[in-house]
A protein has these predicted regions:
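C-terminal binding/interaction regions
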Residues: 135, 141-154, 158-169
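Iron-sulfur (Fe-S) cluster-binding segments and ferredoxin-like electron-carrier domains
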Residues: 124-135
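Alpha-helical scaffolds flanking conserved acidic
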Residues: 101-106, 136-141
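Residues in soluble alpha-helical coiled-coils and helical-bundle/repeat scaffolds
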Residues: 94, 115-116, 133
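Acidic, glycine/proline-rich low-complexity segments that act as flexible tails and inter-domain linkers
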Residues: 18-103, 156-169
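Extreme N-terminal basic, low-complexity initiation segments
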Residues: 2-9
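Short, thiol/selenol-centered motifs that function as redox-active sites or metal-ligating centers
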Residues: 107, 111-123
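Aromatic (phenylalanine/tyrosine) cluster motif
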Residues: 9-12, 19
């Protein structure tokens, strides 16, 4: 009986073995494969606008940023190691690297819209604005979210379009 086209299973027969993935990688593997840049090569993005500027420009953004700051203070008081780790991973994921921070924020915007997280949508729309992403780029990204996420994304689009109107006019 031929096994062509079927995954090969390991010694216990329960987990497929993926022979196309290297078991270990070296820095040379990363550069050759185009994988993520090492941490030493990633850097903080350059924001064109401060959070204060955004808050002064948009009432929706101001309310969101104020609430986020207040709620984050409550989380910080808990001094939870795991939460700090997740926050750190999140921060590092959006640093400049092989992908520009603008692209990463638009990816975050699309994922957040598909997941229907209004706080996340507002956060990424504001960050993208601060990085100099145009309204057209944000709207085109939201079109992708609508296709991927389906019509259930529409109520969230309505809210973020209101924010975009306040930010971009």
């Amino acid at each position: 009986m031929s096994t062509a086209g079927r995954p090969h299973f390991g010694a216990f027969g329960s987990q497929p073995v993926c022979y196309h993935l290297p078991m270990t990688t070296t820095p040379a593997d990363h550069s050759a494969s185009g994988a993520e840049r090492p941490a030493s090569e990633r850097k903080e993005p350059t924001f064109l606008f401060t959070e204060k500027y955004v808050a002064d420009k948009s009432e929706l953004a101001r309310r969101f940023l104020d609430t986020r700051e207040r709620l984050n203070a409550n989380v910080d008081k808990a001094n939870n190691f795991l939460v700090k780790r997740v926050y750190n991973i999140d921060h590092n994921a959006y640093l400049e690297g092989s992908l520009p921070a603008k692209t990463k924020e638009l990816m975050g915007l699309v994922a957040s819209a598909c997941l229907r997280c209004d706080d996340c949508i507002f956060y990424h729309a504001i960050q993208a604005y601060r990085l100099g992403v145009t309204r057209a780029e944000q709207e085109e990204s939201l079109n992708v979210a609508l296709i991927v996420g389906g019509t259930i994304v529409v109520p969230h689009l309505r809210r973020v379009y209101e924010l975009l109107e306040e930010l971009y006019g």
